[in-house]
């Protein structure tokens, strides 16, 4: 025989006992607030309290909760839920209840809080979208009414029409707001000399002057009036022409000021002559690879009408590279046959020399260059220097040779594996022999390695050096603590880490306003 109301009656009695302080065997402290409760109820509803009372039941009369995570109102709400089975958020933030439930491992409450937060986010997004749509609609109505008022001012008014007829030409903002679906206006059909879309002329207005036009006819009349206004407004074109000329003159003044400031730097920099004149006597030099590679640079310099400079210590490098290329061409014309070795050396030298003209373009802002310590060649980046150094080592060392046979290398006699020293070889030999030289003095258990023995010794000393900072539970091994955190506190740790990163990182707006502006004006 079952009593369906027994569980509800039991919870009601326990809740009354808690409020009276009758048979309460524990005290929960959250900051300065104290809560009297029963251990059995707390351990039944929260996995945190279940683990807390599992180890030492007699010595856990007072429980301290982390007040940074669990607030007193949130814990009071969860305590009421434990005894009554009802969750009433009232005016409490859902985030506080979620943090407290995660801390106490009350996963049903966590699911409810997450669902409420999701619904709250969706409702806020919908409300903001509706506000944006309403504001955009009102802006369109205002712009349409302003444009219609301007057009009404430009319309030729007849002397026979009265003020009442003029007021009825355009609708007011109140009428437009009252009828948001009808986004059209009332316009007089005074286009006697303008043909319609079908080729027919629109008749004149009646004496009253009140004609209602459909949306299509209103848009057609608007387009026709705009065409006629563009044709008749010659003065507006002149004004636009003057504005363009003034803007161009401003750009010319800016360019002149820029080049005048660049003249000051000519005393400290060496000008590089990229483009050669046609009347130069050394016109044959312009046919080499250097000028062909820099043809694009010449075109960009001529089109942009700018002068390029480079540091003075790079000018001799360019001259040396040109001279080396000329010498290489002379040698190539003299030698008809080339061996594969000389061809490889020439290709490598050509690659290294071809990098030198680009030093000024690839240089870092600090103007650093990287020199090879073996051949004193200069390279624009450390990556290219590393590639160059690998060619030196490949030529000197060649393929890495194996150690000589007479050298004693620690080798395992069973599997043939080699090791760097005898200590690692001895450790490896224990895997074959099964030797366990390290023995525990308490229980006589043996181990292969010393660190395993030190880990085992903690079992006899009953020490628990590894403590969980979330629930204050202690463990003998670090691996047990890691598994405990992953099992019970994974969601809480992830949420707190995301919050801390969001608070510590600067915003993108602050970075762009401060750092980028300083870099630009340096």
Curated annotation (Swiss-Prot):
Q: Which GO terms describe its biological process?
A: cerebellum development; cerebral cortex development; hippocampus development; homeostasis of number of cells; in utero embryonic development; negative regulation of DNA-templated transcription; negative regulation of transcription by RNA polymerase II; neuron development
Annotated knockout phenotype:
Death shortly after birth. Brain of mutant mice display dysplasia of the neocortex and of the hippocampus, reduction of the number of mature cortical neurons and defects of laminar organization. In the cortex, an impaired cell-division patterning during the late embryonic stage and an enhancement of apoptosis of the postmitotic neurons are observed.
The residue ranges flagged as biased composition, category Basic and acidic residues, are 121-143
Phosphoserine modification, residue list: 157, 516-517
Its subcellular locations are: Nucleus
Can you list the disulfide-bonded cysteine pairs? none
List the residue ranges of the region (Interaction with DNMT3A).
Answer: 310-427
What cellular-component terms does GO give this entry? nucleus
Q: Which superkingdom is the protein from?
A: Eukaryota
The primary site where this protein sits is nucleus
Assembly notes: Interacts with DNMT3A.
Name the family.
Belongs to the krueppel C2H2-type zinc-finger protein family. ZBTB18 subfamily.
Q: What does this protein do?
A: Transcriptional repressor that plays a role in various developmental processes such as myogenesis and brain development. Specifically binds the consensus DNA sequence 5'-[AC]ACATCTG[GT][AC]-3' which contains the E box core, and acts by recruiting chromatin remodeling multiprotein complexes. Plays a key role in myogenesis by directly repressing the expression of ID2 and ID3, 2 inhibitors of skeletal myogenesis. Also involved in controlling cell division of progenitor cells and regulating the survival of postmitotic cortical neurons.
| Identification of the protein by name | Zinc finger and BTB domain-containing protein 18
Q: Gene encoding this polypeptide? A: Zbtb18
